[in-house]
Amino acid sequence: MRKIYEVAKAELQTLFYSPIAWLIIIVFIFQVSLLFTSALELRVTQMLLGYRTPMLTQAIFANPSGGLLFEVQNYLYLYIPLLTMGLMSRELSSGSINLLYSSPITNTQIILGKYLSMVVYASLLICIIGIYVGFGCCVIENVEWRWLLTALLGLYLLICTYAAIGLFMSSLTSYQVVAAIGTLVILTALNYVKVMWQDIEFVRDITYWFSISGRSVSFLYGFIGSEDLIYFLIVILLFLCQTLYG
């Protein structure tokens, strides 16, 4: 385990020495702030106009039409390719992968260490969202905090799944740009496959299984479904195994 932590630490240091990690954090904070203020402004306007605003927790955070967590989910896949494109591609292009293989570190430790670095970065993104969720818990009366924690868990699993896919794509090529584009194409397809050919029952069942982001919807509604939880874990393990043995 110590070797895995060392690889993860080195990867995080490399990531934060580059402007990409900081740029993503800045853009992410700006986007989440914009989405949160938009959702909050809408509810405040409704209250000023005399409309009833029941279930503020759902209205601000878990509303499919403008809720913060739903909107964040729709954009998460855009950030991951920039984070994962250099995980293995950088080592392959520079030749440093040979040094890693010649060191007393196994291939499994290298892959798991690099994936662990993405898990840590995913935790950072969730903490950023958690700031706004925490603010909501302070200002909303009788807030459904268990609901919000479940929703954050769903987003966290979604990011970790995206990261596993990105790591696999990065291991296929020594060109970071190619890895980023490939990851973006796959994640885009997996995000929008759920809206394709929905009038055909057989195809609808298939696209349901391929839609990764759709699996986090139950979490955003406050439900932890064993089927969805197992689905995320299987996809993560599948792509990690493909990276290791592919």
Name these PLM-found stretches:
Residues V27-Q31, S117, T183-L190:
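Transmembrane alpha-helical core residues of multi-pass small-molecule transporters
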Residues L82-Y101, Y115:
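Transmembrane helix boundary and interhelical loop/hinge segments in multi-pass membrane proteins
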Residues T108-L112:
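Alpha-helix N-cap/helix-start motif at helix boundaries, enriched for small hydrophobics
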Residues M1-Y79, L83-G86, I230, V235-G246:
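Hydrophobic alpha-helical transmembrane segments
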Residues E11, I131-F135, A164-F168, T188, ...:
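Alpha-helical transmembrane segments of multipass membrane proteins
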Residues S38-N63, L172, A179-G246:
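Terminal transmembrane helical anchor/hairpin motif
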Residues L34-T37, M55-N74, G113-S174, I224:
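Secretory targeting signals
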